[in-house]
């Protein structure tokens, strides 16, 4: 029977994901902090933080794991038709703080948000270090959708996305797929499988298989300008 590990503020070492609990699925450790070194170590090992505002820091590695292969997003004809009609603009790393704020905004389907001010500050630090990145969707000068996540080697670990206009988050996801495919990325970690991710083409992998793929791809190089701040086009 696996037991929960408790982290202190000095050590960044995590227990192996194989020791995560089955109930709740994937809970591996409690405590520690959200300093860049610890966060980068976590993603390198297939672990991510996820907790509510009144909870301690909780670290997870669920089984199964939701993943995409870059370029394999499912797109319906109606979605593509809708996107072709939109006068939207797209960018990379132009408005990271606005994107994470958009993802943290209250939603009618959720009771509160897990993207706490502490989480926002932590990922802003990672962005400043060139480790966390954002995709933006604009209508004129208004940010209407986007997503953010963290890259480790040729693996992109998606964190959250949002939209204020219909299909803007799907446009951001499609742009992410196109960008990662061009840059030679091998895997998108979408963390916890749900019906929405499945409808977009995510696959559920056994944690063991996911970790094996992560180990293959996490140290592979990417172009120095892979995440350069830029205006980009969505190919439809």
Swiss-Prot record:
Its EC number is 2.3.2.6. It is an enzyme of class 2 (transferase). Keywords: Acyltransferase, Cytoplasm, Transferase. Signal peptide: none annotated. Pfam families: Leu_Phe_trans. One of its GO terms (molecular function) is leucyl-tRNA--protein transferase activity. It is found in: Cytoplasm. It catalyses: N-terminal L-lysyl-[protein] + L-leucyl-tRNA(Leu) = N-terminal L-leucyl-L-lysyl-[protein] + tRNA(Leu) + H(+); N-terminal L-arginyl-[protein] + L-leucyl-tRNA(Leu) = N-terminal L-leucyl-L-arginyl-[protein] + tRNA(Leu) + H(+); L-phenylalanyl-tRNA(Phe) + an N-terminal L-alpha-aminoacyl-[protein] = an N-terminal L-phenylalanyl-L-alpha-aminoacyl-[protein] + tRNA(Phe). It comes from the Bacteria. One of its GO terms (cellular component) is cytoplasm. GO terms for biological process: protein catabolic process. Belongs to the L/F-transferase family. NCBIfam families: aat (TIGR00667). Functions in the N-end rule pathway of protein degradation where it conjugates Leu, Phe and, less efficiently, Met from aminoacyl-tRNAs to the N-termini of proteins containing an N-terminal arginine or lysine. This is Leucyl/phenylalanyl-tRNA--protein transferase.
